[in-house]
Structure formats: C-alpha cells, structure tokens
A protein has these predicted regions:
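Bilobed periplasmic-binding protein-like "clamshell/Venus-flytrap" ligand-binding domains
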Residues: 5-7, 53-88
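Periplasmic binding protein-like
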Residues: 1-29, 61-62
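A broad, low-specificity signal for short, low-complexity segments enriched in glycine/proline
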Residues: 8-11, 39-40, 74, 98
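Extracytoplasmic/secreted proteins, especially bacterial periplasmic and envelope-associated proteins
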Residues: 15-19, 41-48, 57-68
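Short, solvent-exposed loop/beta-turn-alpha elements that line the ligand-binding surface or hinge
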Residues: 1, 21-51, 80-113
Length: 113
C-alpha cells in the first residue's frame, strides 16, 4: 500500500523554479503541500540553483533536480500536461499565443489583415 494524493499546478512564470522551489525548496513548502519530502540535499541544491546566473548551467541543474525528485526518489509523479489548441481565421495575419498557452482574453498578440 502507498498513500498518495492528486493535486494540480499551473505555471505562474516560465521558469523551472516555479515548480521545483514551490514544492521542494524547503521542508515547510514540502509539508504544506502534503508531499512530506525532506531530502535536505535536494533542498540545498534548489537554494543554490536559484542563484545560478548562467542559463545553461541553471537549466542543467534544474533538470538534474527534477530527475532526482521524479525518477530516483519518486516523490513526484507528473500525470499530464494540458494541451492548448487555437483556431486562426482567414482575417488573422499573425497570432502568438502566451507562453503558458492560455489566451482566452488576451488579444495583444493578434494582427489582422
């Protein structure tokens, strides 16, 4: 038997820290989200990763952290990621969706012919 629960999260900003720090950055963050994941080595690495300025090094470290959390420790099991579909009519010259996919009320990136 294994105790588990299901939750959802949508990215607030386009950065892996949005997920990793939010859920695994400190014992308090892990506990309040019912993850009860207390790998202090990972939490120290998350704190250090937040200060990495070089984008390539930073993304490499976040990928390694995700591998540790998901594959090695099995503390988090991503179940799905939403797909966002858009239809563009003949009168639209260009359309650039929001990076996170939601555009239901944002027409600032639309150019008409």
């Amino acid at each position: 038997d294994m105790v588990s629960f299901v939750s959802s999260w949508t990215a607030d900003y386009n950065d892996p820290d949005n997920f990793i720090y939010t859920f695994f950055g400190t014992p308090e963050k892990s506990n309040v989200r019912s993850l009860n994941y207390f790998n202090t080595d990972v939490m120290s690495r998350v704190a250090a990763a937040r200060g990495i300025v070089d984008d390539t090094k930073r993304l490499t470290e976040y990928a390694a952290l995700e591998k540790q959390i998901v594959e090695e420790d099995a503390a988090w099991v991503p179940m799905f990621s939403r797909s966002h579909l858009f239809v563009k009519g003949d009168r639209v010259a260009s359309f650039t969706p929001h990076w996170a996919g939601y555009n239901d009320t944002q027409y600032i990136n639309v150019t008409l012919k």
